[in-house]
């Protein structure tokens, strides 16, 4: 099995506003990056976050392997009008490990679309983040989404929610 890690929107512009547990999430995402066979960075481009701008760039504290691939998107769905499906097919991957930001927008949408496309998914429960919202905290959103993803019913398409350490243990097994 190819250890494919998809890192969503971990960009300077996304983190211009505070996100829950930035430091801890970065540490865990770096652990996944360091042990993955292939890393795909999804980068959102919109408004001030134009492709190539400083705000569009990946957070400087994230590891960026030489063979990493970058896919630019303009919607919450990482597959919408992007080459992501083609990139994954060229890599021969059928199973994706997902992490990144924002839990309740781009991460959630990408997970649901990927599952509907038939990819087997592992979600790093402690390696995605978001911001507090008007009526709910980031921690509550993260916990709620982990629960929803674990229970999501898409027949024949497996979604597993695990901690980073559990994922790494599986990868190193």
Could you describe each region identified by the protein language model?
Residues 11-17:
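Short acidic, Gly/Ser-rich segments with clustered Asp/Glu that frequently serve as metal-coordination loops
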Residues 8, 42, 125:
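Active-site flanking residues adjacent to catalytic metal/cofactor-binding acidic residues
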Residues 1-2, 12:
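Extreme N-terminal tail/first-helix region
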Residues 2-4, 28-31, 38, 49-173:
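Active-site-adjacent betaalpha module
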Residues 18-45:
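A short alpha/beta connector and helix-capping loop motif
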């Amino acid at each position: 099995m190819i250890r494919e890690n998809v890192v969503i929107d971990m960009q300077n512009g996304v983190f211009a506003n505070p996100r829950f547990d930035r430091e801890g999430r970065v540490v865990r995402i770096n652990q996944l990056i360091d042990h993955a066979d292939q890393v795909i960075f999804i980068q959102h481009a919109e408004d001030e976050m134009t492709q190539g701008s400083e705000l569009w760039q990946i957070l400087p504290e994230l590891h960026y392997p030489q063979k990493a691939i970058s896919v630019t998107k303009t919607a919450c769905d990482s597959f919408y009008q992007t080459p992501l499906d083609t990139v994954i097919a060229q890599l021969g991957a059928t199973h994706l490990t997902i992490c990144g930001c924002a839990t309740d927008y781009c991460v959630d949408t990408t997970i649901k679309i990927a599952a509907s496309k038939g990819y087997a998914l592992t979600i790093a429960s402690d390696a995605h983040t978001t911001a507090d919202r008007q009526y709910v905290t980031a921690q509550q959103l993260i916990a709620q989404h982990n629960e929803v993803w674990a229970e999501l019913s898409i027949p024949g398409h497996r979604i597993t929610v695990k901690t980073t350490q559990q994922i790494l243990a599986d990868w190193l097994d």
